[in-house]
Design a protein with these regions (language model features):
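N-terminal nicking endonuclease/strand-transfer module with a His-rich metal-binding environment
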Residues: 1-321
Length: 321
């Protein structure tokens, strides 16, 4: 069955993170970070079968180079706590042929991100362990028609009922900040999850596969199931070598609890079925008894009337004689 896991995170400078380092990790390439003047390289990373950059029409052509793109994205961010990139890990259904993985992710990214003005850097990871997935990085800023990064927010002056600016006691004009783009709006998490579900199912259907992906939470699906905790590659490798981990143990307990709850729900379902059958049988017996009584009482009355008539006739004969 397709696995519904997907995870969105933000690369943050306040967490000592680097967009260049993240790009080097997912692509398998050696990149130089101009911000800290260090080479980012992860030679131990295996299973990278494809990487690709997608650009909107107004992006500078040189951003097709990974090193140039992410150093430019970092250079425009001046704050110590700047958000540098958005990252998404997408599980790819094993039921889709491997030669379609890149097309699947490319179609999704073009539809949902490039069309809105984001630069996209994605890579397909598949070590042949049954866990194919994609790493997707997205730029955080929009660009103007000349390919220049736009501010993340702009000052908007508040107006009174006459359309005039409102002056504060300090002499300044009353204002507030508005985001240039709304990509950080929480609604997009739901929208993108849904669209990823839709395109996966379209590829599954095109390959005549019966499986379907449902990225709604168990609660939204109406399922009384405890979700397991995402293990990650390191935990899976340790578990594969026979080393029990805290996360692995927790997931085993969750699966055991779900199995027990499933058995209890099935038992309750069976009991409800038996109760319904007994109730139906009782109703049948009551209906049968009512039908028998409906026939019995008129017959009894008829017999009584005949007996009464015979008795009356007999008394009449005796009086006559």
């Amino acid at each position: 069955m397709p696995c519904p896991h997907n995870e969105i995170t933000i690369v943050q400078r306040s967490q000592r993170q680097s967009a260049v380092a993240a790009a080097a990790y997912q692509s398998g390439e050696k990149l130089f970070c101009e911000y800290d003047q260090q080479v980012k390289h992860y030679p131990e990373k295996r299973g990278i079968v494809h990487n690709e950059i997608l650009l909107p029409a107004n992006a500078p052509p040189e951003y097709a180079d990974r090193n140039t793109l992410w150093n430019a994205a970092e250079a425009v961010e001046k704050q110590w706590n700047s958000q540098l990139a958005r990252r998404w890990v997408l599980t790819i259904p094993r039921e889709i042929p491997p030669d379609q993985y890149a097309a699947l992710v490319r179609d999704f990214c073009n539809q949902q991100f490039v069309s809105k003005g984001m630069c996209v850097d994605f890579a397909i990871h598949d070590k042949g362990d049954g866990n194919p997935h994609a790493h997707v990085m997205l730029t955080m800023r929009a660009m103007d028609e000349r390919g220049k990064w736009l501010p993340k927010s702009r000052k908007v002056y508040e107006l009174d009922k006459n359309g005039e600016r409102i002056k504060l006691p300090s002499g300044r004009w009353k204002s507030h900040k508005e985001d240039t783009v709304d990509w950080n709006d929480r609604k997009y998490g739901e929208i993108w999850r849904h669209e990823w579900e839709v395109i996966q199912n379209r590829y599954l259907e095109a390959n005549n596969r019966p499986e379907r992906v449902d990225l709604r939470s168990y609660e939204r699906q109406g399922l009384d199931i405890i979700p397991t905790v995402h293990e990650g590659a390191a935990v899976r490798q340790m578990e594969k070598r026979g080393i029990q981990t805290n996360i692995g143990n927790l997931n085993r307990e969750i699966k055991a609890a779900n199995s027990l709850m499933k058995s209890i729900r099935q038992l309750i379902k069976n009991l409800k079925g038996w109760i319904a059958e007994l109730s139906e049988k009782r109703n049948e017996l009551l209906a049968q008894k009512a039908a028998e009584e409906a026939v019995f009482l008129p017959n009894l009355l008829m017999k009584y009337e005949r007996i009464d008539e015979d008795k009356t006739r007999h008394i009449s004969i005796e009086i006559h004689f």
